[in-house]
């Protein structure tokens, strides 16, 4: 039995690690900057959580785990290093945990990791393979942001930021897509592709890689690999491809066909959006290659009802439907808005909170283009996350560019005022959606609290 201290324990991934360690019989505690539903839940599970960071929290007998978002001058991290304690970055520690599992399925990609990881986890669970699953969101069908199973299968998200996934040693890899992101760390798209190439090369010869044939960047990485690469596509013949794709109000169904043109099964999705055709094809490809019965896969995908903050319907007031989505990249925003436009009876009103100054600066034109799909955009202040604003950019710059592009938009800096504005302007049949990876979803809570009418 060891004692662990997690700096940033309230994070979605760190809280899952904390609970896994607790389940394995270790003593676990940690700290976070603010109280949250997660920190309260951890205390209920018997994990001590400090609010705020203080060097006195470190006693000298702990193994310390921290996230990439923790600054180097964090007092707990500084003291742990000064005392010579074992200190691990989150991804590094996860890589060590993986050694305990026979089959590690690591899902990578700029977009869609959480949904695809959750879907694969649920398929394996339905197939009675008793997987351990670690995801970046709450998933109803997994009972949380993780589930503990046997040491046969571990399903985990693999993030490229600061090359985190290069700490992993998966036996099965998934590459959903490769896009410009995290440009505070990566120099350009070529350096991002190089990181994914290194990730793919970690897959052993007796494993396999599932890759998106329709993504040019993915194909340029996968086509040079000597490992077993299994391609999926919605556009052309592949190992697994979607044929006869149809949709009704934003919900898709399709036939899965293999490279020999054999019809395997018909998939019907219970989560909206064309992007989920890709996510479900990737999940199908992994599960079918593992030997899981196609009907079990089909049933699991149909039953899968999504992850928190992924086009999540949060309520309805007087005919106005409220959604929240984690999209924080132009490609994701475009996919989300195209889906919401199909779901909406009237207007789509977006409350957008940019996530990090560096992303806003580097992808500004992409944000303008993608947000232009909305009927109305309310821009609020940047969620800084790990950053200080050394980029000379703000949400007001985005607001001005949207106005110049002819987008109906407002800049409102306080969530309370946003809630009041929405309640005064939204009409029956409209969809109101918070979009962003920060805390913009609090606006929905305020709208629901302030609304005199519930429906």
Swiss-Prot record:
Binding site for ATP: 109-115
Keywords assigned by UniProt, alphabetized: ATP-binding, Cell cycle, Cell division, Cell shape, Cell wall biogenesis/degradation, Cytoplasm, Ligase, Nucleotide-binding, Peptidoglycan synthesis
Localization terms from the record: Cytoplasm
Keyword set includes Signal: no
EC number(s) reported in the record: 6.3.2.8
This protein's GO CC annotations: cytoplasm
Pathway recorded for this protein: Cell wall biogenesis; peptidoglycan biosynthesis
GO MF annotation, one: ATP binding
Main localization category: cytoplasm
Broad class of enzyme this protein falls into: ligase
Annotated Pfam families: Mur_ligase (PF01225), Mur_ligase_C (PF02875), Mur_ligase_M (PF08245)
Record's catalysed reaction(s): UDP-N-acetyl-alpha-D-muramate + L-alanine + ATP = UDP-N-acetyl-alpha-D-muramoyl-L-alanine + ADP + phosphate + H(+)
GO biological process: cell division; cell wall organization; peptidoglycan biosynthetic process; regulation of cell shape
Function: Cell wall formation.
Similarity field: Belongs to the MurCDEF family.
Name the UniProt record assigns to this protein: UDP-N-acetylmuramate--L-alanine ligase
Organism in which the protein naturally occurs: Caldicellulosiruptor saccharolyticus (strain ATCC 43494 / DSM 8903 / Tp8T 6331)
């Amino acid at each position: 039995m060891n004692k662990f201290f997690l700096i940033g324990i309230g994070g979605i991934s760190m809280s899952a690690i904390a609970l896994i360690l607790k389940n394995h019989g270790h003593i676990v505690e940690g700290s976070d900057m603010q109280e949250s539903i997660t920190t309260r839940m951890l205390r209920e599970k018997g994990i001590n959580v400090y609010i705020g960071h203080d060097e006195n929290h470190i006693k000298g007998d702990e193994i310390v785990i921290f996230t990439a978002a923790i600054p180097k001058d964090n007092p707990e991290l500084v003291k742990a290093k000064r005392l010579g304690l074992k200190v691990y970055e989150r991804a590094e520690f996860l890589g060590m945990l993986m050694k305990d599992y026979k089959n590690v399925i690591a899902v990578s990609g700029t977009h869609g990791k959480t949904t695809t990881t959750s879907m694969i986890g649920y398929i394996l669970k339905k197939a009675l393979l008793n997987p351990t699953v670690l995801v970046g969101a709450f998933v109803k069908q997994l009972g949380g942001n993780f589930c503990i199973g046997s040491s046969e299968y571990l399903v985990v998200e693999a993030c490229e930021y600061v090359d985190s996934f290069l700490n992993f040693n998966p036996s099965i890899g998934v590459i959903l897509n490769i896009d410009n992101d995290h440009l505070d760390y990566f120099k350009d798209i070529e350096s991002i592709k190089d990181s994914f190439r290194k990730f793919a090369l970690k897959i052993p010869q007796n494993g396999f890689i599932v890759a998106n044939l329709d993504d040019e960047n993915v194909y340029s990485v996968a086509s040079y690999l000597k490992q077993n690469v299994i391609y999926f596509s919605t556009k052309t013949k592949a190992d697994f491809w979607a044929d006869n794709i149809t949709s009704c109000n934003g919900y898709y169904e399709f036939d899965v066909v293999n490279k020999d043109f054999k019809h395997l099964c018909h998939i019907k999705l219970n989560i909206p959006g064309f992007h989920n055709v890709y996510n479900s094809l990737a999940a199908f490809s992994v599960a079918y290659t593992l030997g899981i019965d196609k009907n079990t896969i089909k049933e699991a995908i149909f039953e899968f009802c999504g992850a928190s903050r992924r086009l999540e319907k949060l309520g309805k007031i007087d005919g106005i439907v409220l959604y929240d989505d984690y999209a924080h990249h132009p490609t994701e925003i475009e996919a989300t808005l195209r889906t919401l436009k199909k779901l909406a009876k009237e207007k789509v009103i977006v409350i957008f909170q940019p996530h990090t100054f560096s992303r806003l600066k580097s992808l500004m034109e992409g944000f303008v283009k993608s947000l232009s799909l909305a009927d109305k955009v309310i821009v609020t202040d940047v969620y800084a996350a790990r950053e200080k604003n050394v980029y000379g950019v703000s949400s007001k710059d985005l607001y001005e560019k949207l106005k110049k592009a002819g987008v109906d938009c407002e800049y409102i800096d306080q969530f309370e005022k946003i809630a009041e504005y929405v309640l005064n302007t939204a009409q029956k049949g409209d969809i109101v959606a918070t979009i962003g990876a920060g805390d913009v979803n609090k606006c929905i809570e305020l709208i629901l609290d302030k609304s005199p009418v519930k429906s």
